Amino acid sequence: MLEIRQNHCFYLFNWDEPRQDQTRFFSPEFWRRQGRISGTAQGRGITWFLQTVDLFGVNAALRHYYRGGLWGKINRDRYTFTSLENTRSFAEFRLLSRLHQAGMPVPKPLAAKVEKLSLGGYRADILTEKVENARDLTALLQTENLSDEAWRQIGKLIRRLHDLQICHTDLNAHNILVQQVKEQEKYWLLDFDKCGEKSGDFWKAQNLARLKRSFLKEAARMGIRFTEGDWKNLLKGYQN
């Protein structure tokens, strides 16, 4: 792990020795000039997909942090700085690193940046592994049914996360990825912004209830294939 400061910017890298141009890894233009941008995804902002296997051993996804909701229309990407470790990018990087080391199927964190601004503000970026040959669960469920065993596997995945006492504050069907690996499916969890460790067990049922609401919402909105039987199978996996 490498941490550096350059003027008003702070960087965290998932390697030990400095690399050429590493502070420019957060600029889409830097990657565009090298012809390494392979695609984009649109959310609150643009996620840039990068061809970086030769650099990092994996392809990468570059994301700038943006606010959502009504506040995001007024203040798109400025956050209040309290400490470096509490910034959005550094906190997500640290959590992903912990989960990755624990063997959880989450994107490997590659680098994080915090740019301090005047009046106690900051902006943030993160560079993570791109999960290949994958689509989010809602996209899959629009055209296919999952097997009972697949639902149980998703339940087991969430139980593993909860056993580590990690609360995914935005646990929903869009943040579960389905990856095709040698004719088998592997399930990943995404988007750990604002997530973290939580003691006790009281919150776990609430977290599962949040996930179920997201399935019901997308069943009504997008027509995804989801039944009460599917949910029961997910719970079986979670409980076993």
UniProtKB/Swiss-Prot annotation:
Its UniProt pathway annotation is: Bacterial outer membrane biogenesis; LPS core biosynthesis
List keywords of the entry alphabetically. ATP-binding, Cell inner membrane, Cell membrane, Kinase, Lipopolysaccharide biosynthesis, Membrane, Nucleotide-binding, Transferase
Lineage, highest ranks first: Bacteria, Pseudomonadati, Pseudomonadota, Gammaproteobacteria, Pasteurellales
For this protein, the record's InterPro entries field holds: KDO_kinase (IPR022826), Kinase-like_dom_sf (IPR011009)
What SUPFAM superfamilies would the database entry show? Protein kinase-like (PK-like)
Gene name for this UniProt entry:
kdkA
Q: What is its EC number?
A: 2.7.1.166
Active-site residue list: 170
Q: What class of enzyme is it?
A: transferase
Task: Enumerate the Gene Ontology biological process terms.
Answer: lipopolysaccharide core region biosynthetic process
Cellular component (GO) terms are:
plasma membrane
Q: What does this protein do?
A: Catalyzes the ATP-dependent phosphorylation of the 3-deoxy-D-manno-octulosonic acid (Kdo) residue in Kdo-lipid IV(A) at the 4-OH position.
Which species is the source of this protein? Answer: Actinobacillus succinogenes (strain ATCC 55618 / DSM 22257 / CCUG 43843 / 130Z)
This protein's name: 3-deoxy-D-manno-octulosonic acid kinase
Say yes or no: keyword ATP-binding present. Answer: yes
Protein family according to the UniProt entry: Belongs to the protein kinase superfamily. KdkA/RfaP family.
Swiss-Prot/TrEMBL catalytic activity:
an alpha-Kdo-(2->6)-lipid IVA + ATP = a 4-O-phospho-alpha-Kdo-(2->6)-lipid IVA + ADP + H(+)
